[in-house]
A protein has these predicted regions:
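Acidic, glycine-rich two-metal-ion catalytic cores of nucleic acid-processing enzymes
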Residues: 121-213
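N-terminal leader/targeting and assembly helices and adjacent pre-domain segments
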Residues: 1-142, 146, 210-213
Length: 213
């Protein structure tokens, strides 16, 4: 099943286009360590102007889709390398940059007549969501490097949590095995490597707790 990073950014329960009030408020509910919280806020703030810039390019209509994808990939690559403190992207991150660049541009062009799709609100929503994916992936890498052997899926436990995520809340598995979430499999919340359904990833606020025993 092909993953749709953006999936029009519509909440299937409300049918309304997604907005966030602030990055701090969005991430604080996830019970992240303070350093991780600040890192995610910083990354989202760095991603936001990149997507706003992209929307302006699309509205201006001066560049081909291929040219915009290339430019977007370059900007995302530099930002992600800074977040991970690396000099080159690994295969997972390279694939991620290519897919999100293609998908966000495709959806924006398709819906360019709707002001929301080129708005600051949408840029913020995408930035927050993609920050969570990148943050969750970084945590998984760090946990493996630090010798953790197991992981536990943690949902936010409120009325916004989708039932398929409630079903795996508290599930503990070996660190390299995937979770089965609805009709999808994921190594961590928002993981794209196994082509999950967008309904299981878009606006997901779940996180993992890693343990050695």
């Amino acid at each position: 099943m092909q993953h749709k990073f953006d999936e029009l950014n519509i909440n299937s329960t409300s049918g309304q286009k997604q907005r966030i009030s602030s990055y701090r408020e969005y991430f604080e509910v996830m019970d992240l360590p303070e350093a991780e919280l600040e890192d995610r806020i910083r990354l989202a703030e760095e991603l936001e102007p990149i997507f706003i810039w992209l929307f302006l390019l699309i509205v201006g209509g001066m560049y081909s889709k291929y040219t915009m994808q290339t430019m977007l990939q370059e900007r995302l690559t530099l930002t992600i390398m800074g977040f991970f403190k690396i000099e080159f992207l690994n295969t997972y991150l390279q694939s991620y940059v290519e897919k999100i660049s293609e998908e966000v541009i495709r959806v924006t062009i398709k819906n360019a007549s709707d002001d929301y799709y080129t708005s600051v609100n949408r840029a913020q929503f995408i930035s927050a969501n993609e920050t969570n994916l990148l943050g969750n992936y970084r945590e998984q890498i760090q946990a493996i490097e630090n010798g953790f052997r197991f992981k536990v899926w943690i949902s936010e436990g409120d009325e916004r949590v989708r039932h398929t995520h409630k079903a795996v809340d508290g599930t503990k598995i070996e660190i390299l095995k995937p979770f089965i979430v609805g009709d999808s499999t994921m190594l961590f919340p928002k993981d794209i490597s196994m082509r999950p359904s967008a309904k299981e990833t878009v606006n997901c606020r779940c996180h993992l707790r890693y343990t050695k025993y």
